[in-house]
Amino acid sequence: MEKQLIGWIFDIQRFSVHDGQGIRTNVFFKGCPLRCDWCSNPESQLLRPQPLYDEKKCIGCGHCAQTCTQNAITTQPTYTIDVARCMHCETHSCASVCYAKALTIAGRPYTVDEVLRIVKKDAMFYGTSNGGLTVTGGEAVVQTEFLVELLKRCKEAGIHTSIETCSACSWDKIRQTLPYIDEYLCDVKHTDPVKLRAETGGDAQMLLDNIRKLAENGAKILARVPMIPGFNTDEAEVESIGRFIASCKIPRVEILNFHRLGVPK
């Protein structure tokens, strides 16, 4: 029997309307090469399950610490999770005994069939709204083999496909998605290599080159610019971003407002 591909996913949101046209199902992939301080989904960064703790929901029962097989959780003097130890855990029993749902585990394995089954549930809404699937994360291209197979299956089913991407992967990986992506939602965070690396750990030249190559290959692109105070909001950088987008002949730009939704995570 052929071995099934496994992808690490931390959320699947149906009836989404903000990441691509129409009504969409957003599939959130684990794993990202960048470490943006303002990331709205920090639980996406590691390519394996990781704990999420919500202090507001915690009732202080201590069951999680008592159950933890890695001795990774301490509740006194403050609630602390040793993530390095937690990464060795295979059971994540701590979350299963948390009745208040203050402790959850972000990420679990899915097969392509499992994801596709969920995506297809809203097929009738895709047809009436020009919607479909949006893969996001994290950076979905990190899991290239699983991603391409999922996209291929969606195209075979007549489902429109979009990807929200930071472009922080090799061109060899990104180009494999070209036959199966209808629209790329590309982040353009900064054009200065020193500043981008300092704030995200990313290689600006690689990111910008990948976007340019997508444009040169005829990809449909929406450039998305997250406005981060003190990072890319000065006049010189805004103009530089604008010149880059114009040089790629990308006709559409979306400005994303700054937020701190990732802070509680």
Name each model-derived stretch:
Residues 1-5, 248:
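Iron-sulfur (Fe-S) cluster-binding modules
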Residues 85, 108-114:
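FAD-binding FR-type
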Residues 9-63, 79-88:
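N-terminal pre-triad scaffold of radical SAM enzymes
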Residues 37-44, 63-81, 91-108:
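Iron-sulfur cluster-binding cysteine motifs and their immediate structural context
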